[in-house]
Amino acid sequence: MLVLALGGHARAEAPVRQVFLVQDSGWMEPFLTAEGSQFRPLVEALVAATRVPGADMAVATFDQDGQVPGRPSPRILYDGAYDAAKVRAAIASIDLPRKAGGTAYADADFNGALLGAIRTGLRGRDGVIWMVTNNKNSPGNSAEVERNTAAFYAALRDSAAISRIVAYPVRMPLKGRNFSEGGFVIYGIGYGAAGGRALESAVSAPALKALFSHPPVSLKPVLAGGLTLRFDRLDTGGLQAGLENGVLIVSGADAAAGTALRLTAHLRNGLYPQRVAAARLALSWSEVGTEAGLAQAAVSPAEIAELAPQAESGPLSVVLTLPPIQRPSGLAGLLSDGRTVDGTLTLRLADLRLALDPAFLERVRPIFGSGLLSGDQMGGPVGDARAVEGRLPGLFRDYRGVSEASVSLPVRIEAAFSPWPLIAAASAALALAAAAGLGALALARARVQTVMLGTVPKRVSLRPYRTQTLRAPDGSRWQVRAGLWGPARATRLQESGPGA
């Protein structure tokens, strides 16, 4: 495993360094010496396609450190900002070094090259390493070199410091003076979190896509960006639904009655070169908040098979059922016109079985079909696709450990409550307010009424619930009080005696 410590995270806007590491051991002879070889122009194009403005880069070669006197491995040929002429000169200077004291070409130490590229090329910090190699060692290498080769693949697979790996197998049949080759591999290795993001950005860029006729092989993680859902029809039954910034928004659902949303979806296999040989499908719903499981989801068919790389499945019927939603109690619930339900639809692929695309195996047969293997490959004849797969580096076979996958889609359901309870409450409030207004008006207005003061009628202007004292023709005093309705009432007051 890698023992180098990751450096501190660079600022988000700071580009990371890149190292272009080219193998120059003996098995690279046809690529470096054959007449008409397009190897060097392709490496130049790789550097140009992945360059990042403002970022430094390095061009280096690797073989086996210590085999060539005075020549370290990796050997930096150029270090600095991208300059097409200087990069071209550096790549043109790549040669085939020979071991000390003989004519044999140098061997290759992949693990030493990886560690050296991190220490020297990346200076121990996050970055991207592009390793151009034919994945071969001499069969006469020492046990130490074989251990180093195995350690190289173990580091790529197991080290948490290496966050992302892609590979571009390149067919390039060439014949040199001593060897014939069918092609080589370009590995993109993201070191550290920032290096992984930079590598992902590079492989998504149009310039690099234009350089290769096939997508890169995603080696780590295997399922990186591989499976996605696409909706092409929303059978909403009168509802409004659509995708906004990756979220499925459904509006107009009836909260009181509940609703069922029917969608037609397709599962896209963005993996390469793995095909989905078989998988069982199950759809689940998880909701944000306390009422988890409020909605229910289902998908049919329940199985999928033979989904080719970079292809879409047939139509999948997705049903999302939302039961009735209770209006919250109290005034807040009465005033609420609806409720928003946030959740996630998750399509799970269980018993997932991936397999390599036969067309890919046929394409890479000349690259990996040689009898000379690196420490992570398996032997055997190369008569069929299974044998070719057995000769791939183990990283290319790590997909066999994947047995499940999932695809998630955020969903927001905007359910509306009926306005009638609010209308009824508002009407009652208006009626009450009107009655209160009429009552206040009646209280404030005086009415002329006829009041009986004993046997004598008298007309007087009275306000409701206010008392007046009147004197009758015979000199008696009366207290008069009127209400909102009915006649006013008169009460005779007791006269004070002369001694009072």
Predicted regions and their residues:
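Von Willebrand factor type A / integrin I
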Residues: 155-253, 260-261
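Cytoplasmic C-terminal tails of single-pass
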Residues: 444-500
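…and closely analogous acidic/polar surface helices at protein-protein or active-site interfaces
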Residues: 14-21, 25-59, 143-159
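DG-centered beta-turn motif at the end of beta-strands
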Residues: 22-25, 126-143
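Von Willebrand factor
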Residues: 69-128, 167-173
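Membrane-proximal extracellular "stem/stalk" segments
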Residues: 249-417
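VWA/integrin I-like adhesion module and closely mimicked acidic/polar interface patches used
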Residues: 136-194, 355-395
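Selective detector of the "anchor" transmembrane alpha-helix that sits immediately C-terminal
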Residues: 416-444
